[in-house]
Amino acid sequence: MTINFYDELRRLLEQIPPGRVTTPRLLAEALGDSRAVRAVLEALKREEFQWARGLVDAGAENPYGDFESSKPLESLRRLQMELSSRVVEFDDFERAELIGGADVAYRGDVAYAVCVVLDADLRPIESSEAVVEVSFPYIPGYLAFREAPAVEEAVRGVSALDVLMVNGHGLAHPRRCGLATHVGVELNLPTIGIAARRLVGREGEPRDGWTPLIHRDRVVGAVLKRNGRGVYVSVGHRVSLQTAVELALRTLRDRLPEPVRWAHRLAGELKRGSKGFYAPP
C-alpha cells in the first residue's frame, strides 16, 4: 500500500477559496503529519504545482485550514503499526549461505532498485532490478512507502536467497517498521536493516563488538563501528538481533556489509545505465 502524495496535495490546494491562502504546516497536518512540511515545500517547486504557489505562504495571517481530508499519512502510520505487530524477532530460517542486499537509487521521480545475492564467499552470483516511477517523496519515518514497491519488485526477481539485508532501518524506527521490516513482513522473508544514519535511539554500553541502540527503554538495534564511523543494524523480520549482528560483522569489509555495498553500487550503476558485476575497489 502507498499513496500518490502529489494527488493528495492537489486535492487540498483545490479546496482553498478565492482570495485565501494557507501555510505549508496546515497542508502537512491535513495530509496527516506535520513532519511532511518539507515534502510539501519541495512538492510546490514542481512544475505541476506552479499554479498553486501563490496559495501558500508560511507567514500568512488568518490562513485557510478548513480542509476536508482523509489524512492519508495517518492511514500509512496505522499500516506500519499493523506490520510491526507481525514481526518475528527470532531466527526463522535454516541457513544463511545466500545473503541478499537491496538498495535504491533515484533520478527524479524514478527509482532504480537492485537486489543482489552473494554466496558464502561474498561473491555476487545473481541480481535482479526494478525501475519504478514513484509518487511519494521522502518524509522521515515513511521511507518504505517511497522505496518498498521498487525493492519488493527487485527482490521477487531473484531465484533464491536465505536472508536479505536492506539499506534502511528495521525495528530501529519510530513505529518499529522501517523499510527492512516493511519489506520483510510483506514478502515474508528474513530481513535485516542496515543503515548509515540513526533514525531513533541512543547508544548504550558497548558489548562484544557492538553497542546496543536503545529507544524507549528497549534495545531496537546495534551500532557497529569501523574506523570511527557507525553502521546501524536492526531486526527486520524473522531474524534475531544477535544473528543480525553476527551476519553484519561476518560480511563487513568496509563501512557497509558487502550485500548492501554491492546493492548500493549496482543501483547507482543501473541509474547511470552501466550495471555489471565487476570487482569493487
Regions found by a protein language model. Give the residues of each.
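A glycine-rich, hydrophobic loop/mini-helix early in the fold
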Residues: 107-159
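Glycine-rich nucleotide phosphate-binding loop and flanking beta-alpha elements
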Residues: 108, 171-172, 198
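Nucleic acid-binding interface residues in structured DNA/RNA-binding domains
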Residues: 2-74
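Short, acidic/small-residue loops that bind anionic groups at enzyme active sites
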Residues: 50-51, 180-202
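Catalytic-site beta-strand/loop segments enriched in glycine and acidic/polar residues
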Residues: 6, 10-13, 149-183, 187-189
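Two-metal-ion RNase H-like nuclease active-site motif
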Residues: 97-107
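C-terminal binding/interaction regions
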Residues: 67-93, 124-127, 148-149, 153, ...
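Hydrophobic/aromatic beta-strand patches that form the interior of the parallel beta-sheet core
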Residues: 56, 100-102, 165, 192
